[in-house]
């Protein structure tokens, strides 16, 4: 760095020699934080308006600053702005361009402000906006799941535990389980947005400022509920970014579980669903292949969200108050995590919207593996008053006989069943069909069609105000 360039550095006054080339390389963040250009200009416009309102700068200076910032915004959005790595970050790139446009007046913009509170407010604005986008994407996914669930309230399928056939359920009930998961994700996004909705602008470097600024004015102008209450915490805090990544990682985990179901169900071994061409790819060598690549990539994106969360937690874990340069690394984690989550939500919403269901294969699978064995035991308890543990044992005996004969429970004769328990009568067979099993489970939240329809109605109503 030359002496002339050093003079142009905002912090260059107390230095005699410039930084090493590798220092410039590791110090520059413009390649990452240029994403914050709109938030940086928005924050600067609010700050300048407040400085004029409190008579810290002249109204005429504010008007020049405002005009210059709007020109810069247009230049960036039209692709005419040249970003410089020599100027380190988005803040200094914009400030340097403002100086070129309006002269020394540009230097008044940074009165009563530090890059510490400047980047804190920029980053909060970006995360807040992204949380809102993610929330909307979640709502769209939930809507598609509700459509699918309502179409398949009576589409019977096996329910699993340990990936082994457990009890018959419906596809509608199954999809509503994911609605509950993504509904919690939506709540977490809303909670995080509300908790972070405080403005750090005006905290300055860490101790506040001696200028008579109005932090409530800038907070209101930027859409924050109120200013942050402690200036040290204001510039030290990245909880809002960590909360976003935490909520995002949970959401990605739910997406990954659903993606895994899609991958399994679309395989030849299951044939429960058919994934559209729009979300599948082929093989370069095997012509018959239809690979569920979109679902696999959604499943993989979970690792990026988990990695981003752990990465930023690790950056922050040992930092003394207040700001440290380590925190410059925060944005790359968040930007990458946000992009991964947005892509995953969009892909999953598209897959669910295009999904074709093989009702016959699902029903056939539900009929296998003694899925109504619990109904057998429940009938013994309910109709004959037999203690459940004893009923469980008797049902096991019936299953062993059916396995030996290679038939279903309902295919055993009444005589064979009465050999296990003489009091069994023909009404037992009424509960051993998949349909009767499903429709009997009317407990709150159960798989009976009436309960699933109630769940769907609840979420349709809740989404209106979510």
Swiss-Prot record:
**Enzyme nomenclature, EC number:** 4.3.2.1
Q: What class of enzyme is it?
A: lyase
Q: Which domain of life is it from?
A: Bacteria
Which cell locations does it reside in? Cytoplasm
Which InterPro entries does this entry report, sorted A to Z? Answer: Arg_succ_lyase_C (IPR029419), Argininosuccinate_lyase (IPR009049), Fumarase/histidase_N (IPR024083), Fumarate_lyase_CS (IPR020557), Fumarate_lyase_fam (IPR000362), Fumarate_lyase_N (IPR022761), L-Aspartase-like (IPR008948)
Primary localisation category: cytoplasm
Entry's Gene Ontology cellular component terms: cytosol
**Quick one: which pathway?**
Amino-acid biosynthesis; L-arginine biosynthesis; L-arginine from L-ornithine and carbamoyl phosphate: step 3/3
Its catalytic activity?
A: 2-(N(omega)-L-arginino)succinate = fumarate + L-arginine
Which keywords describe this protein according to UniProt?
Amino-acid biosynthesis, Arginine biosynthesis, Cytoplasm, Lyase
Is Protein transport there in the keyword field? no
The record, for Pfam families, names: ASL_C2, Lyase_1
* GO biological process terms, semicolon-separated: arginine biosynthetic process via ornithine; L-arginine biosynthetic process
Query: In the record, what terms sit under GO molecular function?
Result: argininosuccinate lyase activity
In the record, the note on similarity to other proteins reads: Belongs to the lyase 1 family. Argininosuccinate lyase subfamily.
Q: What is this protein called?
A: Argininosuccinate lyase
Report the source organism.
Bartonella tribocorum (strain CIP 105476 / IBS 506)
Whichever gene encodes this chain, its name is argH
